[in-house]
């Protein structure tokens, strides 16, 4: 009866696990490989003139997907270095920039690691809360990059062209200057303050 209980516990534990477990030494080398790929992506996509380097990091979760296939969910911090992006240097060998307004960010990444390849599944970086550069949050997302373009931001008022009038442009129509009140269009997503 005792052997039956031990066998049952062993069977239940084996059914709960998928894939082979990562041991501490394997986890460290796998995480290093994932971090190198992630930092390459960060520096290719988001770095300005200078490279970023990891300042701190941790693995939040290991998700086994199959035999020797894992998703690592990592949290890490990055900070700008003295090395220029065009230098081709390894960012981990570069010194951090010193100063009060040095850009820093906190990042979360999901990296798929297999025996053949390492791939960044998702990457999200936001301005570090300890950075004093600004209080607004910047999000860098691999899936969706936002561009802040103001197409009419630099244009001034339209000046009339001499010798050109509305009457010459539309000769069959006469325009009288009337103030037209714009009609509000209900959007359907507003709420009233009364119950029906």
From Swiss-Prot:
Disulphide-bridged cysteine pairs: 83-94, 107-125
Pfam family, one: Spp-24
Disordered: annotated segments: 125-196
InterPro entries from the UniProt entry: Cystatin_sf, Spp-24
Signal peptide (UniProt feature, chain positions): 1-19
Main location as per UniProt: secreted
One GO CC term on file: extracellular region
Location(s), subcellular: Secreted
Modifications the protein undergoes after translation, according to the UniProt entry: Multiply phosphorylated at serine residues.
One biological process term in Gene Ontology: bone remodeling
Stretches of the chain forming a coiled coil according to its record: none
Keywords: Disulfide bond, Phosphoprotein, Secreted, Signal
UniProt feature, compositional bias: Low complexity: 129-138
Source taxon at top rank: Eukaryota
Entry similarity comment: Belongs to the SPP2 family.
PANTHER family named in the record: SECRETED PHOSPHOPROTEIN 24 (PTHR15444:SF4)
Function: Could coordinate an aspect of bone turnover.
This protein's name: Secreted phosphoprotein 24
Protein species of origin: Salmo salar (Atlantic salmon)
Gene this protein is translated from: spp2
């Amino acid at each position: 009866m005792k052997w039956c209980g031990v066998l049952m516990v062993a069977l239940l534990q084996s059914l709960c696990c998928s894939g082979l477990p990562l041991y501490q030494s394997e986890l460290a080398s796998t995480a290093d490989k994932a971090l190198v790929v992630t930092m390459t992506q960060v520096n290719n996509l988001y770095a300005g003139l200078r490279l970023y380097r990891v300042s701190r990091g941790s693995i939040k979760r290991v998700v086994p997907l199959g035999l020797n296939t894992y998703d690592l969910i990592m949290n890490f911090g990055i900070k700008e270095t003295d090395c220029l992006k065009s230098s081709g240097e390894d960012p981990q060998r570069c010194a951090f920039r010193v100063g009060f307004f040095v850009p820093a960010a906190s990042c979360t990444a999901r990296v798929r690691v297999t025996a053949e390849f390492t791939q960044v599944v998702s990457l999200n970086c936001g301005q570090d809360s300890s950075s004093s550069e600004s209080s607004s949050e910047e999000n860098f997302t691999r899936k969706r990059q936002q561009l802040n373009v103001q197409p009419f931001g630099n244009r001034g008022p339209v000046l009339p062209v001499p010798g050109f009038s509305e009457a010459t442009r539309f000769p069959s129509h006469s325009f009288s200057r009337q103030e037209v009140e714009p009609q509000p269009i209900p959007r359907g997503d507003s709420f009233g303050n009364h119950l029906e």
